Amino acid sequence: MPDRVVRVAVTQAEPVWLDLQATIEKTCRLITEAASNNAQLVAFPETWIPGYPCWIWSRLVDFDLNVAYIKNSLRVDSPEMERLQACAREAGIAVSLGFSENSNNSLYISNVLIGSDGEIKVHRRKMKPTHMERTVFGDASGHCLQSVAQLPFGRVGSLSCWEHIQPLLKYNTITQNEEIHVAAWPPLNSEVGDEIPWSMTAEGCKTLSRTYAIESGTFVLHCTAVISESGINSLGTLGGALMSTPGGGHSTIFGPDGRRITDHIEETSEGIVYANLDMDELVVNKMFADCTGHYSRPDLLWLGVSQEIKPVVRPQRAEVDKGTNDQVE
């Protein structure tokens, strides 16, 4: 018998597009459902609240949708976030939540890890939004490099979407002794046109999550959203490069050796994927390779990290020195 088994849940669902309150309601229902099935952790996809801005891959700008998106994005210090925290606490389950964060009407692709006590353990932002995402979202600061927290059942962290192609960012995350990793993605197309890289398809993105599992030796919760015909009509993505056909749901779980340990849900369907994680498997894989431990060479190769918050207004060094000298006088 394994010493430690952790039951996890990965959602595959469609948000209520551009509707903060309705998506909060749906989130609480899914949290409660996962907890009722004895899950200790439930994962939600990238920008689950209020949904991914899919139209950015169809046209350069949409003023009306962008304004609605800003208004319906989630603030960290808000009654809506407090409600989600209370829901996690009442259900007794940890929650990894991807959301569009509104900070003074600037947006960020963000994630919070909420413990079963309802407290926020990690709040991070995507370090660099990908390609067209930069028309909507800003960059993270250095403090968001701390992305893993200890929960009662293990160490949990997350990255968003194509952060999984960033070798240095991945390595920084792995050094935090992660055991369970949430890979948060938007709806993913099974097929795309020749002009779109294969790495942006559902299979390409699953490959990135699976590679992270092998590199890190962690369990990876690959979490995606669904977009329906109604969602396509609401967001005006029909005929666009991505997220223009119903589907997008490819949620699954990978073991630390890279094997898929869950069955797929049909990509147009909503549901929750569950798995019981045998945490002894982490030890078996670390025996073979530990890229931040016995299988590393820090005498030859190492990573430098700055975790500072860089404020937009800060004194010049000369002014700081002058202030110090004035005090001495």
Curated annotation (Swiss-Prot):
The keyword Hydrolase applies. It catalyses: a nitrile + 2 H2O = a carboxylate + NH4(+); 4-chlorophenylacetonitrile + 2 H2O = 4-chlorophenylacetate + NH4(+). The active site is at E46, K126, C161. GO terms for molecular function: arylacetonitrilase activity. The keyword Ribosomal protein does not apply. Its EC number is 3.5.5.1, 3.5.5.5. Residues 6-279 form the CN hydrolase domain. Keywords: Hydrolase. Pfam families: CN_hydrolase. Nitrilase that hydrolyzes preferentially phenylacetonitrile and heteroaromatic nitriles, but has significantly lower activity for (R,S)-mandelonitrile. Also acts on dinitriles like phenylenediacetonitriles (PDAs) 1,2-PDA, 1,3-PDA, and 1,4-PDA, and cyanophenyl acetonitriles (CPAs) 2-CPA and 4-CPA. Belongs to the carbon-nitrogen hydrolase superfamily. Nitrilase family. This is Arylacetonitrilase. It comes from Hypocrea virens (strain Gv29-8 / FGSC 10586).
